[in-house]
Swiss-Prot record:
The active site is at 115 (n6-amp-lysine intermediate). Residues 590-668 form the BRCT domain. HAMAP family: DNA_ligase_A (MF_01588). GO terms for molecular function: DNA binding; DNA ligase (NAD+) activity; metal ion binding. Keywords: DNA damage, DNA repair, DNA replication, Ligase, Magnesium, Manganese, Metal-binding, NAD, Zinc. CDD domains: BRCT_DNA_ligase_like, LIGANc. This is DNA ligase.
Length: 668
């Protein structure tokens, strides 16, 4: 056929196949036999092979990528993908409800959704086309897994409308697909996956999309990052809107008028759990009103308007074979139970934390005891209690050693603490664990430097402190086991790139006691340079918001150690950045901006920058952002499709700006 006829036929085939895919994979209501679908697909493949320039990004033939990737690229999410706070019982839910109503009043409705046990992903669409998909990662930065996500038939390559949005969802492996996959792996003498979630995550992190395509993954989408710009007013309307756009949402959802109705519904949904064709690990409860969501806002880690109810952990009985001791980066000795492998909440468990010596004594835990194990929050395995009546006499009492199992130094118990510690700064285990912490995601975030590689570098005596990482050469690293030319080059490149990190990552990576990632950022933002922080007095540290006495003492102690100062000087000489690179926090009284000290509401869609960027810049100039319009609001900035907030501002005679006025003030 000629080129024009081929073009028209290809367009017709794409429309038809995408329609049939939607009916089959999303609606579960196929209107044609599989053979007819396959015939049309083969016809389209033939046309595109003959005329490659007719192949479009939304073609169903593009779902299975060809090339194997060398590595996943990093992706910064337009809006952070935060985790949810957890509730473990009805009282936790009532506490959540009480906090919500204290902030927004008693007129609250909740949208209740299943918590799918899979992998959280974001899907970026530009003008209606799927252009990028990513894992959640640390919530701010994920990995680009676009080609693998294209293999999931329920993800439309082209939406029903030409929108530029970021959709959030949970990719998962159906139970039937999981069972079939494990049967095949066992047949091929491969290790079976522990649970569907691990299988889904492992499939989406394959560098070869053809492997992901064989795994029969699925997805439920649950939100749009820019939902408040879509002309909808509630979470439940947002899910209906996603249905209209051609996405697959979970239909086991309901709007509830009270928390007691939510609690009753949870019992009903939990009873269905075993019969669902996919795994769930809880229920998500969200305030339905988007205005109320915005008013409630966020903590550093999670939204205040949503909570995840986690199902009670499964408890099983197994045998405690031994107790192993681990030395952490701060010298704490942690006993770990070695168990006869057993399935708990869908995952095979062979180890469980025993926390400390006091807990072992309190529960009278002995080696070879029969113990009850559960997963706390369905994540961390722990020993609940001992079945004393099943003891046979072969059990052995356990006592903590007096010397470090790694270096032989005397162990001490610091006053007021339950943990035993090794206080030898030269302890190999502490140094190794400190290195692992330094390169971790929330610290210096050095790709390719995981526990295995760090252990090799340490054992080969190539690295003894964090400064040594920046002295590594390609010639040294390539000698390590399982390190090829390309992986070595990537590792050296990642190490060099980490030199440019902002100060807060370095501070957290140094492992100063009591200084977590949030405190590290607070200190970096306040003092702006490592030099300023080193000189800070205890009084100056205590004057910083959220820095308490223990934190201040720990910082002073750290920077008074000669060996630490030498290490920091060496890092600076090696080119590691010691300045804060993030936005500066400006007090209202120190700003001459029009925004200083004003209460401001942003509404509608902005063209020149995202809402998060606008918020950050306004706050940097001393403005205070809130989610709802009231008589206390000083200014409303209205973008396109501003909606009810603009109307309310006009009714209350509140000053209203458009985007042009906003940009003018920001550019001053």
């Amino acid at each position: 056929m000629d080129k024009e006829t081929a073009k028209q036929r290809a367009e017709e085939l794409r429309r038809t196949i995408n329609k049939y895919s939607y009916e089959y994979y999303t609606l579960d209501e196929p209107s044609v036999p599989d053979a007819e679908y396959d015939r049309l697909m083969q016809e389209l493949i033939a046309i595109e092979e003959e005329h490659p320039d007719l192949r479009t990004p939304d073609s169903p033939t593009q779902r299975v990528g060809g090339a194997v990737l060398e590595a996943f690229q990093k992706v910064t999410h337009g809006t952070p993908m935060l985790s949810l706070g957890n509730a473990f019982n009805a009282d936790d839910l009532r506490d959540f409800d009480r906090r919500v109503r204290q902030s927004v009043g008693d007129d609250v409705a909740y949208n209740v959704e299943l918590k799918i046990d899979g992998l959280a992903v974001s899907l970026r669409y530009e003008d209606g086309y799927f252009v990028r998909g990513a894992t959640r990662g640390d919530g701010t930065t994920g990995e680009d897994i676009t080609e693998n996500l294209k293999t999931i038939r329920n993800i439309p390559l082209k939406m029903n409308r030409e929108l530029s949005i970021e959709v959030r969802g949970e990719a998962y492996m159906p139970k039937r697909s999981f069972e079939a996959l494990n049967e095949e792996r066992i047949k091929n003498e491969e290790e079976p996956f522990a649970n569907p979630r691990n299988a889904a995550a492992g499939s989406l992190r394959q560098l070869d999309p053809k492997i992901a395509a064989k795994r029969n993954l699925d997805i439920f989408v649950y939100s749009i990052a820019e939902l408040d710009e879509m002309g909808v007013e509630t979470q439940s309307q947002g899910l209906d809107f996603l249905d209209e756009l051609g996405f697959k949402t979970n239909q086991e959802r309901k709007k509830c008028g009270s928390i007691e109705e939510v609690i009753t519904l949870i019992d009903e949904l939990q009873a269905k759990r075993a019969d669902l064709p996919y795994e769930i690990d809880g229920i998500v409860i969200k305030v339905d009103s988007l205005d109320q969501q915005e008013e409630l806002g966020f903590t550093a880690k999670s939204p205040r308007w949503a909570i995840a109810y986690k199902f009670p952990a499964e408890e099983v009985v197994t045998k405690l074979l031994d107790i192993e001791l681990n030395v952490g980066r701060t010298g704490v000795i942690t006993p770990t139970a070695i168990l006869e492998p057993v399935k708990v909440a869908g995952t095979t468990v062979s180890r469980a934390s025993l926390h400390n010596e006091d807990l072992i004594k309190e529960k009278d835990i002995r080696i070879l005891d029969k113990v009850v194990v559960k997963k706390a929050g369905d994540i961390i395995p722990e020993v609940v209690n001992v079945l004393v009546d099943q003891r046979t006499g072969e059990e052995k009492e356990f006592s903590m050693p007096t010397e470090c199992p790694e270096c032989g130094s005397e162990l001490v118990r610091i006053e007021g603490e339950v943990a035993l510690r090794c206080i030898n700064p030269e302890c190999p285990a502490q140094i190794r664990e400190g290195l692992i912490h330094f390169v971790s995601r929330n610290a210096m975030n050095i790709d390719g430097l995981g526990e295995r590689v760090i252990t090799q570098l340490f054992e080969e005596n190539l690295v003894r402190n964090v400064a040594d990482l920046y002295k590594l050469t390609k010639e040294r690293v390539i000698q390590l086991e399982r390190m090829g030319e390309k992986s070595t080059e990537n590792l050296i490149s990642s190490i060099q790139k980490s030199k440019e990190n902002s100060l807060e990552r370095l501070l957290f990576g140094l492992g100063i006691r009591f200084i977590g990632s949030k405190a590290a950022k607070t200190l970096a933002m306040h003092f702006e340079s490592l030099e300023n922080l080193k000189k800070a007095s205890k009084e100056e540290l205590l004057a910083v918001d959220e820095i308490g006495e223990k934190m201040a003492d720990a910082v002073i102690t750290y920077f008074h150690k000669e060996e630490m100062l030498e290490l920091l000087n060496e890092l600076q000489e090696l080119g590691v950045n010691t300045l804060y690179k993030g936005p500066k926090k400006v007090k209202a009284e120190d700003s001459d901006s029009y925004f200083a000290g004003k209460t401001i509401v942003l509404t509608g869609k902005l063209e020149e920058l995202s809402r998060n960027e606008a918020k950050a810049q306004i706050e940097a100039l001393g403005g205070k952002l809130t989610g709802s319009v009231s008589k206390n609001t000083d200014l409303v900035i209205a973008g396109e499709a501003a909606g009810s907030k603009l109307t309310k501002a006009q009714e209350l005679n509140i000053e209203v700006w458009n985007e042009e006025q906003l940009m003018g003030e920001l550019k001053k």
